[in-house]
Design a protein with these regions (language model features):
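Glycine/tyrosine- and acidic-biased, solvent-exposed loop/turn segments at the edges of beta-strands
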Residues: 1-162
Length: 162
């Protein structure tokens, strides 16, 4: 008597595709629309900050702390303007070290990058965008993630935060 063998399942020859993250939530417009970041107005920055070019501000001998005149280590908001009076960047300092948001702008006024510092070290999330608004670099130090993309939104690097 002949016994018919049971059919076997085909062996999959394709590997499962790795799911790539959706970069849309990292676009500048999406981040700003959903108020993920707080960006200060130029008026606020100028009213409450010090223009880097107008003050005698410099580094200490070890180039580690930021100082202001003979008053010692600087605490406050420093900003830079371009030749046309447009805001180029601003950053908060505490006791001579970056402490708080640092934001840099393109000449068009669009945000180039955003990062947060604590005691001179980048903490949390770092965003860098192309001028077209797509994410260039995203580093999440809390969840140890890093994504880099080209100007068309294609991921070029993905892995752990440095």
């Amino acid at each position: 008597m002949f016994i018919k063998p049971k059919p076997t399942k085909p062996i999959p020859t394709e590997q499962k595709e790795i799911r790539k993250p959706d970069l849309k939530p990292l676009s500048r417009d999406h981040v700003l629309e959903h108020k993920t970041l707080k960006i200060l107005s130029m008026e606020y920055v100028i009213e409450h900050g010090i223009d880097y070019e107008d003050e005698e501000i410099g580094w200490d001998e070890q180039y580690y702390h930021f100082i202001c005149n003979s008053e010692g280590y600087f605490t406050g908001l420093i900003y830079k303007l371009d030749d046309n009076g447009n805001l180029m960047s601003y950053v908060f300092y505490k006791d001579g070290l970056k402490d708080g948001a640092e934001v840099e702008f393109y000449p068009s006024g669009k945000i180039h990058y955003y990062s947060v510092y604590r005691k001179g070290e980048i903490t949390g999330i770092f965003y860098e965008w192309y001028e077209n608004g797509l994410i260039k670099k995203y580093i999440d130090r809390i969840h140890d993630k890093r994504i880099e993309a080209d100007e068309q939104g294609k991921i070029t690097k993905q892995g752990k935060a440095d």
